[in-house]
Protein backbone atom coordinates (compact mmCIF):
# COMPACT_ATOMS: atom_id res chain seq x y z
CA UNK A 1 0.00 0.00 0.00
CA UNK A 2 1.18 3.51 -0.85
CA UNK A 3 0.37 6.04 1.84
CA UNK A 4 0.99 9.78 1.55
CA UNK A 5 0.39 11.88 4.66
CA UNK A 6 0.40 15.67 4.99
CA UNK A 7 2.86 16.08 2.12
CA UNK A 8 4.26 19.52 1.35
CA UNK A 9 6.80 20.20 -1.40
CA UNK A 10 8.44 23.12 -3.18
CA UNK A 11 9.54 23.37 -6.80
CA UNK A 12 11.96 26.07 -7.91
CA UNK A 13 11.62 27.79 -4.55
CA UNK A 14 7.82 28.03 -4.80
CA UNK A 15 5.17 25.88 -3.08
CA UNK A 16 4.16 23.06 -5.43
CA UNK A 17 2.08 20.73 -3.23
CA UNK A 18 0.23 21.47 -0.03
CA UNK A 19 -1.09 18.96 2.53
CA UNK A 20 -1.51 15.99 0.16
CA UNK A 21 -3.11 12.93 1.76
CA UNK A 22 -3.59 9.87 -0.47
CA UNK A 23 -3.78 6.11 -0.14
CA UNK A 24 -3.30 3.63 -2.97
CA UNK A 25 -4.31 0.07 -2.13
CA UNK A 26 -2.92 -3.04 -3.78
CA UNK A 27 -4.60 -3.74 -7.11
CA UNK A 28 -5.93 -0.20 -7.55
CA UNK A 29 -5.24 2.22 -10.41
CA UNK A 30 -5.06 5.78 -9.15
CA UNK A 31 -5.06 8.63 -11.67
CA UNK A 32 -3.97 12.16 -10.76
CA UNK A 33 -5.47 14.93 -12.89
CA UNK A 34 -5.29 18.69 -12.71
CA UNK A 35 -4.48 21.88 -14.63
CA UNK A 36 -0.96 22.68 -15.79
CA UNK A 37 1.26 23.75 -12.91
CA UNK A 38 -0.75 21.94 -10.23
CA UNK A 39 2.16 19.71 -9.19
CA UNK A 40 1.18 16.40 -10.83
CA UNK A 41 4.65 15.53 -12.08
CA UNK A 42 6.22 16.86 -8.88
CA UNK A 43 4.07 14.40 -6.93
CA UNK A 44 5.22 11.49 -9.09
CA UNK A 45 8.87 12.53 -8.74
CA UNK A 46 8.47 12.61 -4.96
CA UNK A 47 6.94 9.12 -4.89
CA UNK A 48 9.69 7.86 -7.21
CA UNK A 49 12.27 9.30 -4.81
CA UNK A 50 13.86 11.56 -7.41
CA UNK A 51 13.44 14.74 -5.36
CA UNK A 52 13.14 15.40 -1.61
CA UNK A 53 10.02 16.70 0.09
CA UNK A 54 9.90 19.32 2.83
CA UNK A 55 7.23 18.00 5.19
CA UNK A 56 5.06 14.94 5.58
CA UNK A 57 5.54 11.29 4.78
CA UNK A 58 5.47 8.92 1.79
CA UNK A 59 5.43 5.22 2.65
CA UNK A 60 5.24 2.10 0.49
CA UNK A 61 4.43 -1.16 2.28
CA UNK A 62 5.13 0.61 5.58
CA UNK A 63 8.60 1.83 4.59
CA UNK A 64 9.37 5.51 4.24
CA UNK A 65 10.46 6.57 0.75
CA UNK A 66 13.65 8.60 0.84
CA UNK A 67 15.15 7.90 -2.59
CA UNK A 68 14.74 5.74 -5.72
CA UNK A 69 14.17 2.02 -5.24
CA UNK A 70 13.56 -1.13 -7.27
CA UNK A 71 10.12 -1.54 -5.67
CA UNK A 72 8.96 1.41 -7.80
CA UNK A 73 8.98 1.23 -11.60
CA UNK A 74 8.72 4.48 -13.56
CA UNK A 75 7.52 5.09 -17.13
CA UNK A 76 8.43 8.54 -18.40
CA UNK A 77 6.67 10.71 -20.97
CA UNK A 78 9.76 10.71 -23.20
CA UNK A 79 10.47 6.99 -22.58
CA UNK A 80 14.08 7.60 -21.41
CA UNK A 81 15.36 4.71 -23.53
CA UNK A 82 19.00 4.15 -24.55
CA UNK A 83 19.34 4.47 -28.36
CA UNK A 84 22.66 2.57 -28.50
CA UNK A 85 21.08 -0.53 -26.94
CA UNK A 86 18.62 -2.83 -28.66
CA UNK A 87 15.11 -3.36 -27.35
CA UNK A 88 15.94 -6.42 -25.26
CA UNK A 89 18.97 -4.78 -23.67
CA UNK A 90 16.93 -1.66 -22.84
CA UNK A 91 14.36 -3.77 -21.00
CA UNK A 92 17.12 -5.72 -19.21
CA UNK A 93 19.18 -2.64 -18.28
CA UNK A 94 17.86 -2.26 -14.74
CA UNK A 95 18.32 -5.97 -14.12
CA UNK A 96 21.92 -5.68 -15.28
CA UNK A 97 22.52 -2.85 -12.81
CA UNK A 98 21.01 -5.05 -10.10
CA UNK A 99 23.55 -7.79 -10.85
CA UNK A 100 21.12 -10.31 -12.35
CA UNK A 101 22.89 -13.03 -14.37
CA UNK A 102 22.77 -12.43 -18.14
CA UNK A 103 20.67 -15.41 -19.24
CA UNK A 104 18.12 -14.75 -16.50
CA UNK A 105 17.76 -11.05 -17.30
CA UNK A 106 17.41 -11.73 -21.05
CA UNK A 107 14.68 -14.29 -20.32
CA UNK A 108 12.86 -11.79 -18.10
CA UNK A 109 13.19 -9.14 -20.82
CA UNK A 110 11.78 -11.58 -23.38
CA UNK A 111 8.77 -12.33 -21.15
CA UNK A 112 8.10 -8.63 -20.54
CA UNK A 113 8.28 -7.85 -24.26
CA UNK A 114 5.83 -10.67 -24.87
CA UNK A 115 3.44 -9.12 -22.33
CA UNK A 116 3.48 -5.75 -24.13
CA UNK A 117 3.09 -7.25 -27.60
CA UNK A 118 6.67 -6.84 -28.82
CA UNK A 119 7.78 -10.45 -29.01
CA UNK A 120 10.18 -10.74 -31.94
CA UNK A 121 11.42 -7.15 -31.65
CA UNK A 122 14.22 -7.95 -29.19
CA UNK A 123 17.10 -7.12 -31.54
CA UNK A 124 15.65 -3.95 -33.04
CA UNK A 125 16.95 -0.53 -32.01
CA UNK A 126 14.89 2.29 -30.55
CA UNK A 127 15.09 4.42 -33.70
CA UNK A 128 13.46 1.57 -35.62
CA UNK A 129 10.31 1.69 -33.48
CA UNK A 130 7.14 3.76 -33.65
CA UNK A 131 6.24 6.08 -30.76
CA UNK A 132 3.74 3.55 -29.44
CA UNK A 133 6.27 0.73 -29.62
CA UNK A 134 8.82 2.83 -27.74
CA UNK A 135 6.33 3.42 -24.97
CA UNK A 136 5.68 -0.33 -24.82
CA UNK A 137 9.42 -0.85 -24.33
CA UNK A 138 9.34 1.70 -21.49
CA UNK A 139 6.50 -0.17 -19.79
CA UNK A 140 8.27 -3.52 -20.26
CA UNK A 141 11.45 -2.10 -18.71
CA UNK A 142 9.53 -0.77 -15.71
CA UNK A 143 7.82 -4.13 -15.17
CA UNK A 144 11.01 -6.19 -15.59
CA UNK A 145 12.15 -5.58 -12.01
CA UNK A 146 8.73 -6.73 -10.72
CA UNK A 147 8.02 -3.51 -8.78
CA UNK A 148 5.25 -3.22 -6.20
CA UNK A 149 4.20 0.12 -7.64
CA UNK A 150 4.15 1.30 -11.26
CA UNK A 151 4.39 5.07 -11.80
CA UNK A 152 3.54 6.62 -15.18
CA UNK A 153 4.07 10.29 -16.02
CA UNK A 154 1.74 11.26 -18.90
CA UNK A 155 3.04 8.31 -20.93
CA UNK A 156 0.55 8.59 -23.79
CA UNK A 157 0.38 12.38 -24.11
CA UNK A 158 2.34 12.55 -27.38
CA UNK A 159 0.48 9.68 -29.08
CA UNK A 160 -2.14 9.97 -31.81
CA UNK A 161 -5.71 9.08 -30.81
CA UNK A 162 -5.57 5.51 -32.20
CA UNK A 163 -2.23 4.69 -30.55
CA UNK A 164 -3.35 6.31 -27.30
CA UNK A 165 -6.43 4.07 -27.16
CA UNK A 166 -4.24 1.01 -27.81
CA UNK A 167 -1.84 1.98 -25.04
CA UNK A 168 -4.62 2.71 -22.56
CA UNK A 169 -6.20 -0.69 -23.10
CA UNK A 170 -2.79 -2.41 -22.97
CA UNK A 171 -2.03 -0.80 -19.61
CA UNK A 172 -5.41 -1.85 -18.22
CA UNK A 173 -4.81 -5.44 -19.33
CA UNK A 174 -1.35 -5.44 -17.71
CA UNK A 175 -2.83 -3.93 -14.54
CA UNK A 176 -5.41 -6.72 -14.38
CA UNK A 177 -2.85 -9.43 -15.17
CA UNK A 178 -0.17 -8.32 -12.70
CA UNK A 179 -2.41 -7.00 -9.90
CA UNK A 180 0.05 -4.18 -9.27
CA UNK A 181 -0.61 -0.80 -7.74
CA UNK A 182 -0.55 1.77 -10.55
CA UNK A 183 -0.36 5.55 -10.31
CA UNK A 184 -0.90 7.44 -13.56
CA UNK A 185 -0.37 11.16 -14.12
CA UNK A 186 -2.32 12.61 -17.04
CA UNK A 187 -3.73 15.84 -18.43
CA UNK A 188 -6.24 13.95 -20.61
CA UNK A 189 -9.67 14.01 -18.98
CA UNK A 190 -11.19 11.17 -21.00
CA UNK A 191 -8.14 9.01 -20.28
CA UNK A 192 -8.39 9.77 -16.58
CA UNK A 193 -12.07 8.86 -16.34
CA UNK A 194 -11.63 5.69 -18.40
CA UNK A 195 -8.61 4.31 -16.58
CA UNK A 196 -9.02 5.24 -12.92
CA UNK A 197 -10.45 3.12 -10.16
CA UNK A 198 -9.86 6.28 -8.13
CA UNK A 199 -9.47 9.70 -9.73
CA UNK A 200 -7.77 12.46 -7.74
CA UNK A 201 -8.37 16.04 -8.87
CA UNK A 202 -5.72 18.55 -7.87
CA UNK A 203 -6.31 22.27 -7.52
CA UNK A 204 -4.26 24.92 -9.29
CA UNK A 205 -0.81 25.36 -7.77
CA UNK A 206 0.11 24.86 -5.07
CA UNK A 207 -1.65 21.56 -5.65
CA UNK A 208 -4.17 20.39 -3.08
CA UNK A 209 -6.55 17.44 -3.28
CA UNK A 210 -9.74 18.99 -4.59
CA UNK A 211 -11.84 15.85 -4.96
CA UNK A 212 -11.50 12.06 -5.03
CA UNK A 213 -13.84 10.03 -7.26
CA UNK A 214 -14.32 6.26 -7.18
CA UNK A 215 -14.94 5.02 -10.74
CA UNK A 216 -15.69 1.63 -12.29
CA UNK A 217 -15.10 2.13 -16.04
CA UNK A 218 -11.66 0.47 -15.93
CA UNK A 219 -13.11 -2.55 -14.16
CA UNK A 220 -15.86 -2.77 -16.78
CA UNK A 221 -13.19 -2.88 -19.48
CA UNK A 222 -11.12 -5.62 -17.87
CA UNK A 223 -14.35 -7.56 -17.31
CA UNK A 224 -14.81 -7.69 -21.09
CA UNK A 225 -16.70 -4.57 -22.20
CA UNK A 226 -15.15 -2.71 -25.14
CA UNK A 227 -13.56 0.71 -24.69
CA UNK A 228 -15.82 2.11 -27.41
CA UNK A 229 -18.93 0.90 -25.61
CA UNK A 230 -17.74 2.37 -22.32
CA UNK A 231 -16.75 5.75 -23.74
CA UNK A 232 -20.13 6.13 -25.49
CA UNK A 233 -22.09 5.24 -22.32
CA UNK A 234 -24.12 8.23 -21.04
CA UNK A 235 -22.74 7.60 -17.52
CA UNK A 236 -19.18 7.89 -18.85
CA UNK A 237 -20.00 11.03 -20.82
CA UNK A 238 -21.67 12.64 -17.81
CA UNK A 239 -18.67 11.88 -15.58
CA UNK A 240 -16.25 13.17 -18.22
CA UNK A 241 -18.20 16.43 -18.46
CA UNK A 242 -18.31 16.78 -14.68
CA UNK A 243 -14.55 16.33 -14.38
CA UNK A 244 -14.02 18.75 -17.28
CA UNK A 245 -16.07 21.39 -15.46
CA UNK A 246 -14.03 20.93 -12.28
CA UNK A 247 -10.74 21.28 -14.17
CA UNK A 248 -11.97 24.41 -15.94
CA UNK A 249 -12.95 25.90 -12.59
CA UNK A 250 -9.34 25.54 -11.48
CA UNK A 251 -7.93 26.94 -14.72
CA UNK A 252 -10.12 30.00 -14.38
CA UNK A 253 -9.15 30.42 -10.73
CA UNK A 254 -5.45 30.17 -11.67
CA UNK A 255 -5.78 32.76 -14.46
From Swiss-Prot:
Q: Does the keyword Oxidoreductase apply?
A: no
Q: Give the way it sits in the membrane.
A: Peripheral membrane protein
- State the organism of origin: Shigella flexneri serotype 5b (strain 8401)
Q: What is its EC number?
A: 7.6.2.7
Sequence positions that bind ATP: 34-41
Report the protein name in the record.
Taurine import ATP-binding protein TauB
Q: Which domain of life is it from?
A: Bacteria
**Where in this chain does the record put each ABC transporter domain?**
2-229
Amino acid sequence: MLQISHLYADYGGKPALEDINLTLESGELLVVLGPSGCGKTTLLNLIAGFVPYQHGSIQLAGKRIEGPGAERGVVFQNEGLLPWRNVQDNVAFGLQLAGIEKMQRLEIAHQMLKKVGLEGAEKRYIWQLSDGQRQRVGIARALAANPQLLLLDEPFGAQDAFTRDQMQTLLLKLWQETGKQVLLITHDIEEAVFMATELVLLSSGPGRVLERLRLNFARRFVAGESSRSIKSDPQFIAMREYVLSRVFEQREAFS
